């Protein structure tokens, strides 16, 4: 499922109004807002609607497909606003380093949605769906790391045991 309208019609965003209402946008300074786990872009699109044209919005997601879909949606939302937007394909663990790369040293607001995207469950080939058959992958970025299938089928029992005990 990669049709944006189909995805938006199926997804229900949690705490959307509460989050957006809780963030105060200053009109006398540049607001820099970071969405550290973009996911389904609802929070980001509502936040951009609220921001000033001179503000900066930075969004992170380790899943490149989420970023590609979100870019399309957020370009629509931002076409009249002209908020400066930065798309970063990285995990929020790298937030400080990634922000430094784009010369951002201080932020106004940051928020995290520490769950996974419903896309990961809805599409069997995306990540890990327990509702549909699909490859055993379990990577947010399919260009990095080994698949879960590669690990399960090539690691020694002792290595697998160590992974399961550690994580």
What does each of the following model-derived ranges do?
Residues 1-167:
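S-adenosyl-L-methionine-dependent methyltransferase catalytic core, i.e., the SAM/SAH-binding region
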């Amino acid at each position: 499922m990669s049709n944006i309208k189909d995805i938006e019609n199926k997804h229900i965003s949690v705490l959307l109004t509460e989050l957006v209402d809780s963030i105060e946008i200053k009109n006398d300074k540049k607001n820099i807002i970071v969405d550290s786990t973009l996911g389904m872009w609802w929070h980001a699109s509502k936040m951009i609607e609220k921001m000033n044209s001179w503000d900066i919005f930075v969004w992170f997601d380790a899943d490149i497909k989420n970023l590609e879909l979100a870019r399309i949606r957020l370009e629509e939302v931002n076409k009249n606003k002209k908020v400066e937007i930065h798309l970063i394909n990285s995990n929020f663990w790298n937030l400080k380093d990634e922000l430094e790369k784009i010369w951002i040293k201080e932020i106004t607001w940051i928020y995290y949605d520490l769950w996974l995207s419903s896309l990961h469950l809805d599409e069997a080939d995306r990540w890990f769906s327990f509702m549909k058959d699909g490859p055993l992958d379990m990577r947010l970025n399919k260009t990095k790391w080994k698949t879960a299938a590669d690990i399960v089928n090539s690691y020694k029992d002792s290595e697998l045991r160590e992974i399961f005990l550690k994580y």
